[in-house]
Every structure is written in structure tokens, then in C-alpha cells.
Amino acid sequence: MSIQLQKTMQRHRGLFTTDHRTIGIRYLLLSLLAVAIGTVLSLFMRIHIVSPDLKLPLFGQIPPEGYLALVTMHGTLMVFFVLTTAPVNGFASLILPSQIGAQRMALPLLNAVSFWLTSLSLTVLLAAFFVPGGAPISGWTNYPPLSAIAVAGPGQATGMDLWLVSIGIFCFASILSAINMLTTIVSKRCEGMTLLRMPLTVWSWLVTGVLILFAFSILFAAVVLLLSDRHLATGFFVPTGEVINGLLLDRANSHANGSPMLWLHLFWFFGHPEVYIAVLPSMGLTSSLLANFTRRPVFGYRFMVATTLFIGVFGLLVWGHHMFVSGMNPYAGTAFSLMTMAIAIPSSGKVLGWLAMLLRGRDSRVHPMPTPMLFTFGFLSFFIAGGLTGPILAQPILDAYLHNTYFVVAHFHLIMAMAGAFSLFAAVYYWFPLMTGRLMHETLGKWHFWLSLIGAYATFFPMHFAGLAGQPRHYAQLIGSTSTFLSSLLPLQTGITHSALFLASAQLLFLANLAWSARRGKPAGSNPWRATTLEWASDLTQCRVVRGPYEYNFQSNLSDFVMQCAAEPEQE
């Protein structure tokens, strides 16, 4: 066999590898690409809002329909390919097997197939920018009938089809990934790793996997039905006699007796669990990192497990609070409101548990505070700030005014986008040694944290005031004869735009830190954070777990911690 052929075969083995760590890193790089594109799109949106006549380099002046296309693609990229792909597919592939003492995922080929399908999904989505008409303009929720009729506007023909195909592929890939994740947790735990010895990150991935099976199956079905309406003239979502751009849709046996409400129910049955699919892994990571850096056991481990399960169950039951103004039965609105208030109870319990860990560990926590701990504080801050507006939007009478305003944009960007992003940063800084064998630069990391924290609050907190003033989201501009009542908000929106540019610029520090640390970072050693969970164990080939995952403040003159697989405390 020639040397060239050997190199080619090695290259293909690497390309189509089933190694879980390699696939996990590839997922994270895919998410990094998606977040870079999504961030650029959001900056174009912000610039257009305050300067609609500005001609951007390479893009020219963005028309109103172009702004709506940016909204659609930004939301889709961030929700699906960043906040779902990175914490679930990426870090679960990278870390999950090691945390339960397994050598690999239960279904490694399925893991690889899921990654390549996700990559295909992203490619199909981005292709929508380059087809006639461009990307769809109906928002990342794509409500019918606007999304069901090709003549409804620019981007609603081929671009809309590509969006639906992309999301269908993504749903299928996510379901495969969830099956693999759940099978791994159930069948690959090492000796002694009982359910109540699993780290809380594993519990969060377990519940997240179940949510994915339910939520993405429903979204996949909804996508198929919408494609059927568009190309087979079925009538699932388009009412009889609908007029779109002057065209009466009254053809015989087509688009008869459909209802956009059906799409709302199907989409939001996926959409609200998606919030917890994005946030639950962050909750598990927060508990683990707080225990690690305060050098104290998790406060109420069983309670934390119970709240995770409670959130998973109730996360499937509260989708209707997105539909208070849709015309659904008011009694149903009351029921959804009560259940939404109820789901705040376990979330509040988690916050109280985290605060108790900080209080108990105030004398024993690591000094100086490492970067992963800072970003964990950031997650906690955004989760509380965004969560406080949740009960407001859960009231039908208040939501009637605030629905579809910037108040909602501020709410979900704080509790989902910023909380999720800061948790992802914490995870990267914490687990970077497992990927490269090196530590990330602490000074750059701290600058990255503080600039990002300031930029995030300066960007999203003022949006609450824009929403309270009545500004709807998705408006392409604030000036002109149609926007007279919004012109007074232009200074506020200008400040938000400047803050968004500042926040995006701060992320260059993170990219620089990644590039520098991967090559020249300080060697990490086998367990740089002196952690107790198995991903930091030096050998998992004959691993046997003999204790829980958070044995810190261990009463010994040798060490203040003991790993799950260690019979005695480790020598320092």
C-alpha cells in the first residue's frame, strides 16, 4: 500500500470518525460558526433599525423585507444551531461518556450520523440566502398563512422550502442524538455509578434527551404538514377563503378549513421545551462548578435532581402561554398561566440552592476566582434577571399589552440567550484542558467576562423600556410617516445598537484566547480544578465508583476533595 493511499485512508478515518470527543469538538466548532454568522446578522439588524438608509459594504441598503429575513435567519441560527447544538450535542458528546465512566457513546455511529446531518441542515439553511427571493421573512416561528403560501412575499417560495427542509433534517438529527444520549446514560454507566451518584450535568442531559424526543418529534410533524400545505394543496394551516396579496385561495379541495392555530399549538409544544433544552444543561453545569469552586458539596443533591425532573415534566405543559392573544379559550389561558407560575417554583428552588452553596462556601472558595466561576456567576445573574419578567408575561392581562413587543425580546434574550451563552463560556473555560491539555489565559478570560457582562446588560436591559413604551418587535425602522409614535424611542435604540456592537467586539477576546491557549496555554495537568467527577480521572478502563459526585470539604489532612472512583483522598 502506497504512503499516499495510507494518508488518504487516515484522512477519511479522521473525517468520518466515531470518536465521541472528536465529534463533540466538531459540534462546538459548528456552533461557533453558527454564532458568528448569527451575530453578524444581528448587528446588521441593529444598524438598520437606527440607520435604515445606510448602505452596508458588500450588502448595500437593506430593504424592509431584507430586515425580516435577517430576523428569521438570526433566530433560527441561534436557537437551533447554537443554544441546542452546543450544550446538548457538543458537550454531551465530549463529556457525557467520561462522566459516567464509559469509554464511548453507546451508539457511536449514530453520533457521527447525527453530526453530519446537523452540518447538512446548517448548509441547507444558509443556502436560503442565495436562492431567488432570498431567505424567508416570516420569523423563526414561521406562522401560517404567511409561511404556507409561496406568493406571500419575498423569500416565501424556495427560501421557505429550504428553511423547512433544514429544520426537518435538524429535528431528525436531534432525535438520533437524544436516543444515543439516553441509551448511553442507561446502559453504559460503570460499576457503582447508580442514578443517585450521577453528576447533575448527566441528570440534566437525561431530562433534556427526553424533552428532545417529545418536542422535536412534534416539530418534525409540523414541518411535514406545512410542506404538505405548500406543495400538496392540503389544508392543515390555511383557512378557507384566505386572501394573500390579492389572491383568493378558494380552489376546490385545496386549503379548506385549515387553521393557523394548529401550527401555533404544534410549534409552541416544541418551542417552550426548547427553552429548557437550552437551559437545563446550564443548570447542571452551574451546580457542578459552584461545588467545585466553593469546595463544598452541592446543596440538596436529591432536591436538585427532583427540581430537574419537575422542570422537565412541566416544561411540556406550558406552551399555551405563548398564545394568550391568539384567540384561544380564556379558560385554557388561565390553566396555562397557573402552570407557568408553577414551573417557577423548581427554578426558584435551584436558585436558592445555588445561593446557599455560595453562602456556605464563602470561606472555602477558590481565590482568586477563576474564569469559569465568573461566567457561572454571569449565568446566575442573567437567569435571575430574565426569570423575574417571566411571571409578568405569564399573566394573560399583562401579556395582552406586552406580547410581541421588545419586552418579550428582552426577556428571552436574558434568560435563554445570555444565560445560555455565559454558561457555554463557563463550560469552554472549564473543560478546555480536556480538549487541548492546556488552560485558557486567565487575564484574557476575566476581561472577556466583564466586558461581555456590561455589554449584555447594556444591550438587552433597555429593551424592557422600549417594550413598556409599546414598541413592537420586527419593525424594520423607527423613522418615517408610519413610525411617528416610535420616533421618540430612536435615542434608546441607538444606545442599544452601540451596546450590541460593543458586546460583539468583546467576543474577539474570546477568539484570541482560544487561538492563543490552544497552542501556548499553560499545561493543565490531569486534574487542574481538583474536581471529583470522572472526566478528570486519569484512567477509566477499570473504573469503579464508590461515592457521590461532589465530595468536597472532605475531612482529611491529605486533601479537601476525593474523586468518585478513589477510595481515599488524593495526595495534594
Where are these regions (language model features)?
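Membrane-embedded and interfacial regions of multi-pass energy-transducing membrane proteins
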Residues: S2-E572
